[in-house]
Amino acid sequence: MRVLGIETSCDETAAAIVERDDMGEGRILSNVVLSQIAEHEPYGGVVPEIAARAHVEALDRLVDRALNDAGLKLYEVDAVAATAGPGLIGGLIVGLMTAKALAMAAQKPFYAVNHLEGHALTARLTDGLPFPYLLLLVSGGHTQMVLVRGIGDYERLGTTIDDALGEAFDKTAKLLGLPYPGGPAVERMALQGDQKRFALPRPLKGEARLDFSFSGLKTAVRQTATELVPLTDQDVTDICASFQAAVADTLSDRVGRSLERFKTEFPDCATPSLVVAGGVAANKTLRAALENLCTRHGFAFIAPPLNLCTDNAAMIAWAGAERAATQAPDSLDIAPRSRWPLDEKSAPVFGTGRRGAKA
């Protein structure tokens, strides 16, 4: 089965075609992504109106390019899939309406995909990973620990009770006068810094619950920077290194407890695995810390290629293909959802968490 996927949930416009065979193995035929960093950089963050307009301007030609790169015509794909949420509502509307129109014109089945499910299933595309496994999703809009039991069967073990990790990176960068996007900027500066200079907090470390918290760490960074004004270059690099070390320790504590819980629930699992996805998963220091953690616990550490960790349409096409193998198509009447939890059975987190894109 060949599926055309479309992703427009935030500030990347993307189209891709993925093939899934009868054995459940996947192959990416094309994967086109257009970033909007240049459009949003002057504002220090994503502006929803600008993002939606940029999607409108770019999406048609990206779909054409994805088809051309795959050597296919629209009528030769077997289904169309698009992100229906969560995300910025303007961008979701652009992608969803385009995908519906293409599906209707070509008389192909349509699948509305949860963006988080795309991240959750990427390791099955890249590594053929069997169920069950653990997913750590770390991005600008999410920080979640998820147990993936099967297609559509997800249990949220932990989530952020305030800021997403990617947002904490971006806010730290902004406090220190670093360029947008903040995550890569903080990582670059941290390489030159002393991570032991500042004793920043490790929120919720040692607690039994598996939730995350980063607002206190962000506040500590602000207080530290304020006390040092005017900041020297060495101050900035040391704050970045100390911040990144605190994040690595916090993730290791939360994830370590999740690995122990997984082994208790699935003692006979032959291939216990931790998958890390989302834009923050591109951070090499955090990857190394989590990989070492997995080695100590006897887990395989799986991080998709960097271009598949950040937002892309290949993961959306693949999620559509996985669902198409066992589920009926979605109605063309389906509406976009700016908020759409992957695990709809778990109690929602009220009054906390990111209030913005893909919250």
From Swiss-Prot:
SUPFAM superfamilies: Actin-like ATPase domain. Its cofactor is Fe(2+). It is an enzyme of class 2 (transferase). One of its GO terms (cellular component) is cytoplasm. The keyword Transport does not apply. GO terms for biological process: tRNA threonylcarbamoyladenosine modification. It catalyses: L-threonylcarbamoyladenylate + adenosine(37) in tRNA = N(6)-L-threonylcarbamoyladenosine(37) in tRNA + AMP + H(+). NCBIfam families: gcp_kae1, T6A_TsaD_YgjD. Belongs to the KAE1 / TsaD family. This is tRNA N6-adenosine threonylcarbamoyltransferase. It comes from Brucella melitensis biotype 2 (strain ATCC 23457). The lineage of its organism: Bacteria, Pseudomonadati, Pseudomonadota, Alphaproteobacteria, Hyphomicrobiales.
